[in-house]
Amino acid sequence: MHYPEPISKLIDSFMKLPGIGPKTAQRLAFHTLDMKEDDVVQFAKALVDVKRELTYCSVCGHITENDPCYICEDKQRDRSVICVVEDDKDVIAMEKMREYKGLYHVLHGSISPMDGIGPEDINIPTLIDRLKDEEVKELILAMNPNLEGESTAMYISRLVKPIGIKVTRLAQGLSVGGDLEYADEVTLSKAIAGRTEM
């Protein structure tokens, strides 16, 4: 189908988002045409602002407006425990349960040889540097319970064991193949309480 160039560009832009295929992108593009101009401008500004005003915490890798982030700055946090997660949505899911009081480290992905993603492509080197500099006693590996998450957890566990830090994994109860961000607070709470040493 031939569209006017601005619509084609908008459809292509929407298709860059995860889970958005050609039909959904087309629907979103045409919906944008029906929106009030002020709403479109506000939407476009929100997209630009999120890129300009947010950064990643230099300590843990979590999204933040200020560096370091509010979690790393919180002196009430237990600095002897770091929970390693795959992405920012996992930090948000863990924080919702309001039980975990330690720090975080966001990897921004998981090891996936099939996708050409190795350990050096995610935030593992900064984790190892951090463990050498801080008084960490326990590392909780909270990767998603899928093949990539398990591979990443095993890799980190092997790297960290020689340093002498206790390495634990969230307890089962999280469904295999599922994502941490979709788990409810009760499931996450039980998983953190029943974590096991690796």
UniProtKB/Swiss-Prot annotation:
It holds the Pfam family RecR_HhH. A zinc finger (C4-type) spans 57-72. Residues 80-175 form the Toprim domain. Gene3D superfamilies: 3.30.60.80, 3.40.1360.10, 6.10.250.240, RecR Domain 1 (1.10.8.420). InterPro entries: DNA_Rcmb_RecR, Hlx-hairpin-Hlx_DNA-bd_motif, Rcmb_RecR, Rcmb_RecR_Znf, TOPRIM_dom, TOPRIM_RecR. SUPFAM superfamilies: Recombination protein RecR (SSF111304). GO terms for molecular function: DNA binding; zinc ion binding. One of its GO terms (biological process) is DNA repair. Keywords: DNA damage, DNA recombination, DNA repair, Metal-binding, Zinc, Zinc-finger. May play a role in DNA repair. It seems to be involved in an RecBC-independent recombinational process of DNA repair. It may act with RecF and RecO. Belongs to the RecR family. This is Recombination protein RecR. It comes from Staphylococcus haemolyticus (strain JCSC1435).
